[in-house]
Design a protein with these regions (language model features):
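Hydrophobic/aromatic beta-strand elements that line small-molecule binding cavities or substrate pockets
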Residues: 38, 85, 96-102, 121-128, ...
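Beta-strand/loop substructures that line and gate deep hydrophobic ligand-binding cavities in soluble
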Residues: 4, 112-165, 172
Length: 178
């Protein structure tokens, strides 16, 4: 009887080990790991959209979970400007520091993001076509702790869904003229 219980327990731990190994292999070899991209066509000119990307008060209206954004440098929005963002999703709080790495008002903004668990590069590009503008977002994130790297195959699709929801919310508030 004891041998049977030991075999079941050993088999259970073996299955868990295989699952963890599979996630580890998937996170190490997944093409585009930590990479997100999405675009949305907004029926407004770029000049009406850009403030929603740069104004902390407006960002809170469309970025789910953004609780706070405060500048860490003076001089307004410019290359080199830094800010701190606090994201709250459920009970989980993430503190991030952002630095503007490229800026062309109403056309482009790129930001480097750092936090305890990850680093990332985000790029917003606006392209006008007639009365509408296509906003293209790309984000490339690198997870530092082993556990986050292991869970990357689960994190990235979830982050992609959040991104797509946020961009649809942005489209809605900008087009409503709020």
């Amino acid at each position: 009887m004891k041998k049977w219980i030991l075999r079941v327990v050993a088999g259970f731990f073996l299955l868990i080990a295989l699952f963890v190994l599979g996630l580890y292999i998937a996170s190490g070899g997944a093409k585009g790991k930590g990479y997100h991209e999405a675009s949305v066509v907004i029926n407004k000119p770029a000049v009406a959209i850009f403030p929603w990307l740069t104004d902390p008060g407006k960002q809170k209206e469309w970025i789910f979970g953004l609780a706070e954004s405060k500048p860490l440098t003076e001089g307004g929005l410019r290359v080199g400007a830094r800010s701190q963002e606090i994201m709250l999703v459920g009970e989980e709080q993430t503190v991030m520091e952002s630095e503007v790495t490229a800026l062309d008002p109403n056309k482009l903004m790129a930001v480097k993001v750092t936090s305890e668990g990850f680093d990332g590069d985000i790029r917003y590009a606006l392209e006008e076509a007639g009365a509408s503008t296509t906003l293209r977002y790309t984000g490339d994130f690198r997870y530092r702790p082993f556990m986050l790297r292991l869970l990357e195959p689960l994190i990235t699709p979830s982050a992609q869904r959040k991104l797509e929801g946020d961009l649809m919310k942005l489209k809605s508030v900008v087009e409503a003229g709020q």
